[in-house]
């Protein structure tokens, strides 16, 4: 066993990330930041980065806003009205900065770009990068998301013909 493996033995794998890239050219090269700040001023900018920070604290990098306590906590962190936070998040979904379907159907926040930007952290840990949650019943507005693809079983056709016995 190598020294790194010995040192890591018995440690719990860290959940979430401690940092994420905040690119210095985001104000001029990111239509998301430009648009959200144009529409909502500094509140838009602040909510977007607080949302990314919040996603980074989550074990699977998504935020299920159906959990009322966690939602109220997030809104309180933003220091603005819930209506403004919702307006900003709706705009982020319309711009596909967060997954539109997960937000509109399930009120779950997931960002492919965020997960891609922190993937190297998980690779260094030797664990799988969290994947976008998938819901068992996509028509329900609430539910427990799955992060593993749902396997469809093939239809079994019987060759038994009862008339030929």
Positions of predicted regions on the chain:
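Short, low-complexity, polar/charged sequence segments that are solvent-exposed and flexible
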Residues: 38-43, 67-69, 119-120
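Winged-helix/helix-turn-helix nucleic-acid-interaction surface
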Residues: 1-21, 71-72, 76-165
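Alpha-helix N-cap/helix-initiation sites
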Residues: 41-45, 63-64, 81-86
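Short recognition helix of helix-turn-helix/winged-helix DNA-binding domains
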Residues: 1-60
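Generic alpha-helical secondary structure signal
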Residues: 31, 42, 68-72, 83
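Short acidic, hydrophobic short linear motifs in intrinsically disordered regions
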Residues: 58-76
């Amino acid at each position: 066993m190598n020294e790194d493996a010995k040192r890591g033995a018995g440690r719990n794998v860290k959940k979430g990330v401690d940092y994420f890239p905040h690119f210095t050219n985001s104000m001029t090269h990111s239509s998301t930041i430009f648009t959200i700040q144009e529409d909502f001023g500094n509140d838009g900018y602040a909510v977007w980065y607080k949302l990314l920070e919040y996603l980074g604290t989550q074990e699977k990098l998504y935020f299920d806003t159906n959990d009322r306590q966690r939602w109220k906590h997030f809104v309180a962190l933003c220091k603005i009205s819930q209506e403004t936070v919702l307006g900003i998040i709706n705009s982020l979904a319309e711009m596909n900065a967060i997954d539109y379907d997960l937000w509109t159907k399930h009120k779950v926040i997931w960002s492919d770009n965020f997960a891609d930007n922190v993937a190297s952290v998980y690779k260094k840990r030797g664990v799988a990068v969290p994947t976008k949650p998938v819901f068992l019943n996509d028509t329900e507005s609430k539910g427990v998301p799955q992060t593993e693809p749902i396997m469809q079983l093939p239809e079994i056709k019987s060759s038994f013909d009862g008339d030929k016995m």
